[in-house]
Amino acid sequence: MSTSFENKATNRGVITFTISQDKIKLALDKAFNKIKKDLNAPGFRKGHMPRPVFNQKFGEEVLYEDALNIVLPEAYEAAVTELGLDVVAQPKIDVVSMEKGKEWTLSAEVVTKPEVKLGDYKNLVVEVDASKEVSDEDVDAKIERERQNLAELIIKDGEAAQGDTVVIDFVGSVDGVEFDGGKGDNFSLELGSGQFIPGFEDQLVGAKAGDEVEVNVTFPESYQAEDLAGKAAKFMTTIHEVKTKEVPELDDELAKDIDEDVDTLEDLKVKYRKELEAAQETAYDDAVEGAAIELAVANAEIVDLPEEMIHEEVNRSVNEFMGNMQRQGISPEMYFQLTGTTQEDLHNQYSAEADKRVKTNLVIEAIAKAEGFEATDSEIEQEINDLATEYNMPADQVRSLLSADMLKHDIAMKKAVEVITSTASVK
């Protein structure tokens, strides 16, 4: 294989590489064997057409595309490795020449990892808003949240107020015509929860069981269902029940209901204070780490960050998010309808965070390289065991999912973060 690289612009260039006849022949054989079972030829059983007959009848060139798909990934990776390039996005592949009996020549437009010029990243002085202190109010607020969680809904005779739950039937229409998804029976709606479009819940405040209420609203311009976006709608709503929350008394019995390991309200307060102090300390340490890393990134200069890196990170984040939604039984279409957002909105939502994450990773990688951090065999083994414990899976399964290079990279990154944070101080 011969390879060359022509620089076209900062972090951009073209790789030209060849594929040998030996590798081409193997790829052509694989391509032929893949389709052989479906081939017919006079005098031969189906799937037994000899290669020379195929070449004479169809021409070997018809196999070139499949053969290229077979041989290209390995050839491209070998070219990148030989040239010592750090490619960060999918290449644009073009065929330069594919002549019978000769080496194939291809080109790949690539984007390479940008240069990072490090600034100060040790002994940084940072400011954080977080505090390790836990007040009595913090403890009381945690108990109050648990108290509210134990509240029961009871039937209310009077008018519905904010925070009450109404059980309703509703039928929606636009210009007198009902629309899909605009109808519901015995639906429990907490007033003030924001479950329905703006203005709907407010118009049910003051209603009583048995009332029929005409609710008039306008769908937001950004509503997912384009045929409803910006349109005025009317919902004929029947109130079946009004329910209000009944919260338990703040006493020792409540404390035991919240946590069976305590006997009194005072015991619960002591326990919650310890839990909150531990959580606050973790949050404080995380805030210091985040501020120190952010300052280290700000002190560095990334030379012409390729936009492709941001796009790939956005796509990765969006795909991960939508995958989580689908595992919960929510399709992309359902998600966008429920939230009144679009695919573009979701991409925009992740763009700023993607930009920050890419820059942070580049700077931390540069620090790891500057410090000469590497992972030892024992550190790799410890990382595997830690991941196995964290995700409750066998260590061998972790080994099969993560390559040694990935583990070495992650360990080096952790060491770089430790250098930043362990030397930082708070102003």
UniProtKB/Swiss-Prot annotation:
It catalyses: [protein]-peptidylproline (omega=180) = [protein]-peptidylproline (omega=0). Its EC number is 5.2.1.8. Keywords: Cell cycle, Cell division, Chaperone, Cytoplasm, Isomerase, Rotamase. GO terms for biological process: 'de novo' cotranslational protein folding; cell division; chaperone-mediated protein folding; protein transport; protein unfolding. Disulfide bonds: none annotated. It is found in: Cytoplasm. GO terms for cellular component: cytoplasm. Belongs to the FKBP-type PPIase family. Tig subfamily. Involved in protein export. Acts as a chaperone by maintaining the newly synthesized protein in an open conformation. Functions as a peptidyl-prolyl cis-trans isomerase. This is Trigger factor. It comes from Streptococcus pyogenes serotype M18 (strain MGAS8232). The lineage of its organism: Bacteria, Bacillati, Bacillota, Bacilli, Lactobacillales.
